[in-house]
Amino acid sequence: EAVDAGAQFIVSPGLNPAVVEWCLSNGIPVTPGCITPTEIEKALSYGLKILKFFPADVYGGVKGCKALFGPYKSEGVSFIPTGGVDLGNLKDYVGQPFIHAVGGGFLCRTDDLAAHNFEAITTTAKKAVEILLGFEFDHMGINADSPEKSEETAGLFEKAFGFVPKFGNSSNFAGPSLEITKFPGLGQNGHIAVKTNSMPRAIHYLSRRGVEVDMETAKYKGDKMIAVYLKEEYAGFAVHLLEK
């Protein structure tokens, strides 16, 4: 009935073999609820790796998901927790490698829907996106033209303000928020780094807002992207994302 009404995927609170088998036979993506190793192994036998975790607050929340993820990490299992998730604890789930997505009725409260209070729903959704992305200033970069100049500049900040220098291969830091490159980098005036909880989500979000990233500048740690610059400079500063 749900598919006939236009549903393109099915999410269920538990793992009902009849429902799962019907969905697989009819090419409908399905995400069953699984809260025990037995249920997870049953889902894996169907080739399903993205699983609902419901009700999340009753079965341990982040700790519960993490505990179940441990023995099935190599299988690529991830969870969609729902039930008891709200703006207050949403941040706890963000960035965890075993969390595929998060759901909750807090995004669209029944009374707001009944009253057609779409402004309140929009405000809540925007706040949720802000929490998911977690954009924060991380550091500012100063372009030096040599390793010696970079070290000298870091020393000046230490002498004046007590910013303890940290020396690296391609740059030096004066305290946690000032990076002095050893050679001229991107940006006429230097660069600004903005942290985010999720690089893929941040790039998608920015692209939807017409902000382009320069994928040629992307840096990886293994298969995971950890930094990438925007194509546009802001007031002479190159801007790059940095995953927390």
Segments and roles (model prediction):
Residues 23-27, 111-133:
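C-terminal helical cap(s) of enzyme catalytic domains, especially alpha/beta-barrels
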Residues 122, 178-182, 207-244:
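Vicinal oxygen chelate
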Residues 7-16, 29-40, 49-59, 81, ...:
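Catalytic beta/alpha-barrel core
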Residues 13-19, 52-61, 98-121:
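Glycine-rich phosphate-binding active-site loops on the catalytic face of alpha/beta enzymes
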